[in-house]
Amino acid sequence: LKSTKIYRSLEELSVYELNRFDKFIQSPYFNQNPQIIQLLQILLPYLKKNESEELPKQNIWGIIYPEKKYNDARFRKLSSDLLKLFEQFLAQQIYDANPIHQANYLMESISSRKIEKLYNTVVSSVKRLSARQLEQSSSFFFYQYQLEKNQYNLTSEFEKKFKKKSKYSTLNIEEIAKNLDIFYLGEKL
């Protein structure tokens, strides 16, 4: 088992990251398969102690499925499912670490669902978040461009809905163009 892709991948994590992955796997939102939880629980002590002792697949199978005969195809499927969840965990870590991504996806979601009640609070929180960003690399301006574009889409969507230009009339076309230009120049240089 130690030569499998999932085991080798999990070996790269620190104990802290392994604990976070364990919490991720325990979440019913991300994982509804209790056998995957069991598999990880069996692997965790070996991973945390960095033991070189081999883990026979048949022994692990016997712990997870005590009443069933070893089935290599099902065991590989279980390992593959754990690997997919691990990949999802890695992506989730990046998402959680980037509040601008989160704000951008939130604005997209509000726009696609046409949830007018959240418009003002989300736009103001996005503006506060943008103002607090210290790093202003070219990717920052790309995300700013996306945020401004989503704000524009939200604003124009609600103006269409109410057929008036009072509450949402501050269109941000100049900001959209400015952020896209800065991103382009930053990438070009």
Which residues fall in each region the model found?
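Extended alpha-helical scaffold regions
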Residues: 1-189
